[in-house]
Structures are given as structure tokens and as C-alpha cells.
């Protein structure tokens, strides 16, 4: 089973695995990443402000990081990303078995790196899929390469589990790759709706559960009960597993 996951805007330059015996890996799309960095590095600070809608210290730091990209520290992807979903991962408590599961099963989609394995060495960045820095847009820049890569690493009949946000799962070509979507909804007065902050946390908790319990098939997935969420069979179908809970 392979799992796709979203990156986060929040990042840190801290490698929590520095003193562990882990084999770090190289990003698969370094050439394409360098193309994007080259494009960004030619932009003025005013152009970066307009493209990224940033101001003040965040703008200055982002511009500085772009100009000094070569000097930035390499951090494994799973340690670098530090947003809401990633904070639900109990990384420092993971056993050797859990770390191996992460290494073998997780793919983090990204605007700058395409698709990264958990222990690929990356550098911090700021870039969204909707930002216009290439003629055809970032979705088109990445789509073929990411789909070819995922198709190649999936074994025959292996599941691709979608724990990514819609912004990033749109990268996947459903005609080329069969995917099981996981979604989380809150029930209130008989209606169901997705609430962004809850969904982000739930995706992180769900991934954490998969890793710690070495989940490898759909039969195990539909039995998961987590943080009040259960599979909702009325809302789910063979390609979309909807987990719901009552909003108290």
C-alpha cells in the first residue's frame, strides 16, 4: 500500500532523526526542482510579493531563502514539514518497524519537489500550486512526472490511499491510477460537512494510526475507529471511504 499526503506551509529546519540509523534518500526530481528555483531566483522581491501575496518579515525571509537556496540545510521531508497534520505524527516514538513502514509507504506531494519519500532530503520553501510561475501552471508542470513515478512504484494490485487535500490529490490522474480516497466529515443536525482544521488533524491521526499499526489492506482500514470517527457506509463507496463523527 502506498499513501499520498499533503505537505504543509509550516516547516522547520530540524532533523529529529539525526542520531538515528536511518538511510536518507535523494529527491527524485532534483532537475525539475532546480528549474523552479532558477525561475524564482530571477524574480525581484516585488514580484515575489505579488506572486505569493506576502508582506513584511515573511516576504523578506522567503526572498532571502530563494536567493540562498544552495546554502539552506537539508532536512528529511517527514521532519521538515510541521503543519497541523504532521504534528499528529508521533515521530519520536516510532519503532524501527514504524519508520520502515513510513519509508516504504508514504509519498508527500509537493509544489517544489513533486513527490517525496518520507526520508528524502529537502530544503524549506514556500510555493503553492495556484502561484503563477510557469507558463502552463504548476499542476501541468508536475502532473505527468508524478503520475509516471507513482505508476512505476506501485506493484500490481497495490492500493494507492489518498490522505492528501484536494489541492494536491488533483495531481493524480484517476484514469491512469486507481485510488482510494479517505475523507472526514462532521455530523451536525443530520447533515455532514468537512471542516478544514478538523480534516487536517484527522488526516494526521489517521496516518499515525496506519504507521503504528502497520495497516496494509482495505479490510483493516474500514474497521478503524479513531478520535470519534467511524466509517460511514451510507456515504462511502468502493473508491471513497468517508469517516464521520458527531460534532459535539
Curated annotation (Swiss-Prot):
Highest taxon of the lineage: Bacteria
Disulfide cross-links: none
GO biological process: response to hydroperoxide
Cellular-component GO terms for this entry: cytosol
Coiled-coil features, chain-numbered ranges: none
Family: Belongs to the UPF0246 family.
Descriptive protein name: UPF0246 protein FN1762
